[in-house]
Amino acid sequence: MEKTLNLVKNDPWLEPFAGAITGRHQHVLDKEAELTNKGKQTLSDFASGYLYFGLHRTDKGWTFREWAPNATHIYMVGTFNNWEEKAAYKLKKQKNGIWEINLPADAIHHGDLYKLNVYWEGGQGERIPAWATRVVQDEQTKIFSAQVWAPENPYKFKKKTFKPDTNPLLIYECHIGMAQQEEKVGTYNEFREKILPRIAEEGYNCIQIMAIQEHPYYGSFGYHVSSFFAASSRFGTPDELKALIDAAHEMGIAAVSYTHLRAHETDSYL
């Protein structure tokens, strides 16, 4: 017999929907148990997976990791190997569905495009890595690919710590691409230079940036997210976004953003 949630007990109007509410609640608990390995780690640990997964520069070169428990083979393909499957770019399967490859420093370079060729029982396909931090769209084919983002002189935040004034918190909702007067897609730099000063002048201390993660359909206002860890390349580079956030903090303005995922295979994560 299912246990009645206090939420339903406290609100009789919810009784007709008790089954659906209880089912959804249990689904959340089951998913949390899966993501936290039954409580052996926290949701914060899971959310920090980008520090471990994805492409990272190391003292010896590069390390790339992906979680793909149902895969049988995975190759990294890109402009660095003419998009061909090479033994040198084949990932090795580790424990718990993790795949990994270590590459020398000259194997890939800043600006290279790449994807994963993933094989599974009965199928195969190209996929953008789940933890890609930079994804760009080809102007001709309109196809999205991950991009290596490792500039020689990456942007360094000038304001190391920041705590906004929340008494009260005055939030200005904005969209980077639609904030300009011109009929075009605005940029991070334009927003920083032209819009932020006006927001500060009006007395706001927080900007809620409408979904800023990479999304294939611009008309979704950014809410068809395909890559959680990649800021939209339509508006500029990761470093230009950092400069925008830095400038906001200098003006006493906090920055928040929220969104949800898009269900699609070829331009989304694994």
Language model feature labels by segment:
Residues 1-61, 84-85, 90-173, 178-183, ...:
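The feature marks proteins involved in alpha-glucan
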Residues 67-73:
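Short proline/glycine-enriched turn/loop motifs at strand-loop junctions of beta-rich domains
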Residues 172, 207, 255-257:
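Hydrophobic faces of well-ordered beta-strands that scaffold small-molecule active sites
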Residues 174, 209, 248:
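Conserved, mostly hydrophobic/aromatic
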Residues 175-189, 224-236:
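The substrate-binding groove and active-site-proximal loops of carbohydrate-active enzymes
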Residues 187-198:
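Short, acidic/polar
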Residues 198-242:
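Aromatic-lined carbohydrate-binding/catalytic grooves of carbohydrate-active enzymes
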Residues 259-266:
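Conserved small/polar residues in nucleotide/adenosyl-binding loops
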